[in-house]
Amino acid sequence: MSKFFRRRKFCKFTAEGVKEIDYKDLNTLRQYLTENGKIVPSRVTGTKSKYQRQLATAVKRARFLALIPYTDNHDI
């Protein structure tokens, strides 16, 4: 057996009973973005595939409406 035990990942949206992810909820969306603005994969976050698809769509809508930047690191 391994020396270290990892905590089991769980879907936060399933636990809270979320029906649909809202693109206007920026605090929730930012939890699933890296500091560069990329969407964190579900194998890292533990999000179910249904909610990962909704999350990706919500992030893309928020980016298009300029609620979230496409990238945070701009080298000048």
From Swiss-Prot:
Keywords: Ribonucleoprotein, Ribosomal protein, RNA-binding, rRNA-binding. Part of the 30S ribosomal subunit. Forms a tight heterodimer with protein bS6. One of its GO terms (molecular function) is structural constituent of ribosome. One of its GO terms (cellular component) is cytosolic small ribosomal subunit. InterPro entries: Ribosomal_bS18, Ribosomal_bS18_CS, Ribosomal_bS18_sf. Signal peptide: none annotated. One of its GO terms (biological process) is translation. Binds as a heterodimer with protein bS6 to the central domain of the 16S rRNA, where it helps stabilize the platform of the 30S subunit. PANTHER family: 30S RIBOSOMAL PROTEIN S18 (PTHR13479), SMALL RIBOSOMAL SUBUNIT PROTEIN BS18M (PTHR13479:SF40). The keyword Transferase does not apply. This is Small ribosomal subunit protein bS18. The keyword Ribonucleoprotein applies. Belongs to the bacterial ribosomal protein bS18 family.
